[in-house]
């Protein structure tokens, strides 16, 4: 069973990864509560992911999907705050710590298929200290909807959900849901030929990841 599960996750990475094509989204079906959704999101140790704590979000596929997520500034000519979310090229790079905060203020653990806010917990200058919350911005040149970091208001930054891909492997994906609607889309990888970076963007093919504690 585990071998089949690993094959399933790996097959997601063997599908074409678009570069020049514009994003033509396939809307996901709304997630309904099931028995499995009563299980909290788990890290690679099988421990519950705690609300408001820091974790690494790392590609579930060793050698094929890269490493963890990082906040960078791809435009070196710009003096603006780092706002680009990329997948590290190295399998050994866990990326930057990410704080996962449920929209429900009373939640103590992170539950799948519920709204979350993601923010990078990294050292930055005073001008950029609040420019770490995830959101979605459209890029007219590429036609992509990129995951960006910035001063997003709560209504725009807590529209993400962690969805279960495989229970046996504690593998997950992220979906983005438009505010006030049930329209949800996969967050996947997009290889940017201009910057030669793999960026997070809305995609028909999800970025499948595992969650690592930052104290490992």
From Swiss-Prot:
This protein's GO CC annotations: vacuole
One term of GO molecular function: endopeptidase inhibitor activity
Protein's name according to its UniProt entry: Sporamin B
Listed InterPro entries: Kunitz_inhibitor_STI-like_sf, Prot_inh_Kunz-lg
Subcellular localization(s) per the UniProt record: Vacuole
Tissue-specific expression: Accumulates specifically in tuberous roots and tubers upon tuberization. Sporamin accounts 60 to 80% of the total soluble protein of the organ.
Biological source species: Ipomoea batatas
Superkingdom per UniProt: Eukaryota
Signal peptide: 1-21
Pfam family, one: Kunitz_legume
Swiss-Prot/TrEMBL keywords: Signal, Storage protein, Vacuole
């Amino acid at each position: 069973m585990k071998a089949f599960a690993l094959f399933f996750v790996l097959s997601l990475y063997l599908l074409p990864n678009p570069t020049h094509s514009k994003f033509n989204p396939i809307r996901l079906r709304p997630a309904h509560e099931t028995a499995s959704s009563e299980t909290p999101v788990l890290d690679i140790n099988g421990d519950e992911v705690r609300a408001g704590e820091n974790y690494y979000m790392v590609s579930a596929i060793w050698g094929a999907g890269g490493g963890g997520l990082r906040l960078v500034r791809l435009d070196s000519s710009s003096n603006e705050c780092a706002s680009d979310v990329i997948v590290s090229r190295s399998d050994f790079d866990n990326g930057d710590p990410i704080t996962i905060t449920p929209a429900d203020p009373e939640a103590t653990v992170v539950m799948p298929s519920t709204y979350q806010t993601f923010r990078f917990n990294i050292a930055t200058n005073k001008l950029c200290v609040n420019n770490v919350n995830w959101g979605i911005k459209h890029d007219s040149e590429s036609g992509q909807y990129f995951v960006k970091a910035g001063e997003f208001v709560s209504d725009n930054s807590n529209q993400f959900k962690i969805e279960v891909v495989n229970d046996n492997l504690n593998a997950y994906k992220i979906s983005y849901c438009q505010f006030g609607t049930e329209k949800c889309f996969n967050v996947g990888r997009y290889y940017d030929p201009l910057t030669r970076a793999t960026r997070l963007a809305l995609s028909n093919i999800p970025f499948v990841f595992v969650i690592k504690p930052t104290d490992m």
